Amino acid sequence: MSEKPEKIVLASGNAGKLEEFGNLFKPYSITVLPQSAFGIPECPEPYPTFVENALAKARHAAKYSGLPALADDSGICAAALNGAPGIHSARYAGDNPKSDTANNLKLAAELVGKADKSCCYVCVLVFVRHKDDPRPIIAEGVWHGQWNDTPLGQNGFGYDPYFYLPEHGKTAAELDTEVKNRESHRAQALAELLRKLAL
């Protein structure tokens, strides 16, 4: 990338994601601002893939903010459920209101009795320099784990308390922040994005 932006807008209202991306970009002296700082309305996510939804959100945020924008579309995919909840992870149990607890309970109920508890977190990041960027930068990270029937840990959000990592003997919510920032699906996708941005 020819010049490094000082500020980018994150196309999300999720406080957990904002903190995570803020920490990951800090070493590069790039400030990550929430789209709420610009009064950006929520972008529809009508598409069946992580890539299409992330691209729509990035263009939407760049249009309203006038800044380069980063969007992520991410979710958990359970092998026994053919990849569900997938793109529906954030609203798996509905919208009234969105709730991590309700989402976790729904997925836990659907995995009861399933022999295959393997699942993965997927993160697709899309960076656009401006709203009409003809060459968006796309990166993907996949973090493999197992569904844990009992929630463990406080250091995380979303499905983290149930996402068990056999190599650590812990759930994602039990990992130290430093480890999570190095190994998570978002960290993997961001590492690929940073390589492509040549920061």
From Swiss-Prot:
Signal peptide: none
Positions that bind substrate: 12-17, 74, 157-160, 180, 185-186
A single GO BP: nucleoside triphosphate catabolic process
Active-site residue list: 73
SUPFAM superfamilies per the UniProt record, alphabetical: ITPase-like (SSF52972)
UniProt keyword Acyltransferase, yes or no: no
Pfam families: Ham1p_like
UniProt cross-references to InterPro entries, sorted A to Z: dITP/XTP_pyrophosphatase, ITPase-like_fam, RdgB/HAM1
Cofactor binding mode and count: Binds 1 Mg(2+) ion per subunit.
Enzyme's top EC category: hydrolase
Entry EC number(s): 3.6.1.66
Binding annotation for Mg(2+): 73
Keywords: Hydrolase, Magnesium, Metal-binding, Nucleotide metabolism, Nucleotide-binding
NCBIfam families xref list: RdgB/HAM1 family non-canonical purine NTP pyrophosphatase
Protein task: Pyrophosphatase that catalyzes the hydrolysis of nucleoside triphosphates to their monophosphate derivatives, with a high preference for the non-canonical purine nucleotides XTP (xanthosine triphosphate), dITP (deoxyinosine triphosphate) and ITP. Seems to function as a house-cleaning enzyme that removes non-canonical purine nucleotides from the nucleotide pool, thus preventing their incorporation into DNA/RNA and avoiding chromosomal lesions.
HAMAP family: Non_canon_purine_NTPase
Assembly, per entry: Homodimer.
This protein's name: dITP/XTP pyrophosphatase
Organism: Neisseria meningitidis serogroup B (strain ATCC BAA-335 / MC58)
